[in-house]
Amino acid sequence: MPSMDIVSEVNEVELRNAVDNSVRELKGRFDFRGKEASIEYKDHIVTLTAEDDFQCRQLVDILRMQMSKRDVDPKSMDVDEKAVHSGKTFSLKVKFKEGIETLVAKKLVKLIKDSKLKVQSSIQGDSVRVTGKKRDDLQQVMALARESELGQPFQFNNFRD
């Protein structure tokens, strides 16, 4: 009986590459010349620092663009609402969603059940296990999960026949 797991993970290596590319782009940008701005990655948190709030938001856009180039889904970003002002700099913290939260997992299971596909889905910790009689049904579930607007990117692993 075919089965698969739906998970939400961020590729650590690609994320680090995206941050490094963002730092490289920041150094070459004309609008940041002579300004105090930085992008740092530590403990799965990206810290964006700039001289004003507008520039912090520009840094978020730079990071988002570089993440999409490196095939890291920007939907996994969790950006602070307000920039923290300390001294003459503003800083934003960007966290990344790892694992599927229980509420999102319940919505995903309900979405799968409402689709009337002949599959069973169950929540297992921070992933959702889907089993069905045919591989085609699982592929339809994959398409359904990708199209869903649940605010989180999904990956599929442990696909077994």
From Swiss-Prot:
Q: Which GO terms describe its cellular component?
A: cytosol
CDD domains from the xrefs? Answer: YajQ_like
Q: Which InterPro entries does the annotation name?
A: DUF520, UPF0234-like_C, UPF0234_N, YajQ-like_sf
Alphabetical list of Gene3D superfamilies matching this protein: 3.30.70.860, YajQ-like, domain 2
Family of this protein = Belongs to the YajQ family.
State the protein's purpose.
Answer: Nucleotide-binding protein.
PANTHER family noted in UniProt:
UPF0234 PROTEIN YAJQ
Record-given protein name: Nucleotide-binding protein Shal_3198
Q: Which organism is it from?
A: Shewanella halifaxensis (strain HAW-EB4)
